Amino acid sequence: MRLLMITIILAPPMAGLILGHAKPQTQATQSGEAKRFLGTWRLVSIVSNSQMSPVFGPNPVGMIYYDGTGHMAVQIMPDGSRPKFAGSAPTPEEAKLALTGYIAYFGTFTVDEKARTVTHHREGSLTPGMIGIDLVRRYEFDPSDRLILTPVEAPAGHLTWERLL
């Protein structure tokens, strides 16, 4: 009897997955400027108030990905000069230091060509308080096809990304 109840409860959702009737992923309309975002980008620099950002050091590293289904992910961290853990597991202080300045989140994105902004709709983040909070960035593509993102709330700073793929 218990097996029959489990089968009745699970059968409809599983059938949808097996037969391809499950809810499709959100498809973004990628036209015009939005298509220029698609691909893999490497962080070139972070400038804050016309100076290199001290939080990330002189040579921060990072990647950002935009795909044709409207999904994106980003990771940014300080340069490689951070100390390694003394043991196999970090001490509380080592763990805190490892997370300092590390940014990682994923979600979907939308492009507003008229406003020349891209919005990252965060669905997951290393920083729990940032989940569900949108990030709006003004964008421009320079003549060498680098992507420059400027936070709307801090227009004196910007991130420059170089296309890899």
Locate each region found by the language model.
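Positively charged n-region of N-terminal signal peptides that target proteins for export
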Residues: 1-4
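Active-site bordering "gate/hinge" segments
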Residues: 7
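Lipid interaction determinants
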Residues: 10-11, 16-165
